[in-house]
Every structure is written in C-alpha cells, then in structure tokens.
UniProtKB/Swiss-Prot annotation:
Molecular function (Gene Ontology), one example: RNA binding
Pfam families for the chain: Ribosomal_S9 (PF00380)
Keywords of the record: Ribonucleoprotein, Ribosomal protein
Source species taxonomy: Bacteria, Bacillati, Bacillota, Bacilli, Bacillales
GO biological process: translation
Domain of life, source organism: Bacteria
Protein name: Small ribosomal subunit protein uS9
Protein family membership: Belongs to the universal ribosomal protein uS9 family.
Keyword Transmembrane helix: no
Length: 130
C-alpha cells in the first residue's frame, strides 16, 4: 500500500526547499543529513521547527527536505516556508494558525544589487575634502 506523503515548496532569498512530510516519529532529514548535523546554530534549528511547534504536530511527521541555493539562513527560512505549505495539505484548518504566525508569506526581501560608481549597493567611496 502506498504511504501518504504531503509536499510543500518553500523559498527564501536564493534558497529553494522541496519538503516531504511523512507520518512518522519526528525525524528531520535535510539533504540526506540529520537536522542537527546540517545546521550548526541552534537558532536555525528552531526556525525550521517553528511551523511544527505552532500547529502542535511535533513528533507526528518525519520531514525529508531537499534544499539548494543560498546560505544557511536562507535555507532555514525556505525549509520553514515549505513545511508550512505541506502542513496546509495535512489539514486546511492549520491555515489560520500558520497565516497568523507569518509562515505562509514568502519573504520577498532580496539582496540589493551593487550600483556602478559605488563600492557596494549603497556604500560610496570614501570622500576626501582635499
């Protein structure tokens, strides 16, 4: 018999996360590695787990994630977004909870481009009066 799986795609900065929720005991696997092994910082682990904690389903689903692009912070945000979207498939009643917490909103903030004549996006070259 086929096992029930719920899918969600999350994005943040330049990171894209493809998330699968499978009924299980709460293991989170990111790119074939355990969550604790993949993310060193505790804050990033908390960010990833937020939607599960908010909806009260911690320990009920195994989470399998493929994430690529961006850095660790962007990847953690993308995973959070993907898990939230997958939890909507699990139970549409979760929408109000997830929406209020802001987990369903794609964070549109991106790195500002560097402009010519400047050293960075807004950093101007040092000014010399004389």
């Amino acid at each position: 018999m086929a096992q029930v799986q719920y899918y969600g795609t999350g994005r943040r900065k330049h990171s894209v996360a493809r998330v699968r929720l499978i009924p299980g005991e709460g293991k989170i696997v990111v790119n074939g590695r355990d969550l604790d092994e993949y993310f060193g910082l505790e804050t990033l682990k908390l960010i990833v787990k937020q939607p599960l904690v908010e909806t009260g389903v911690t320990g009920q689903y195994d989470v399998h994630v493929n994430v690529n692009g961006g850095g660790f912070t962007g990847q953690a945000g993308a995973i959070r977004h993907g898990i939230a979207r997958a939890l909507l498939q699990v139970d549409p009643d979760n929408r109000a909870t997830l929406k209020a917490a802001g987990f369903l909103t794609r964070d549109a903030r991106m790195k500002e481009r560097k402009k010519y004549g400047l050293k960075a996006a807004r950093r101007a070259p040092q000014f010399s009066k004389r």
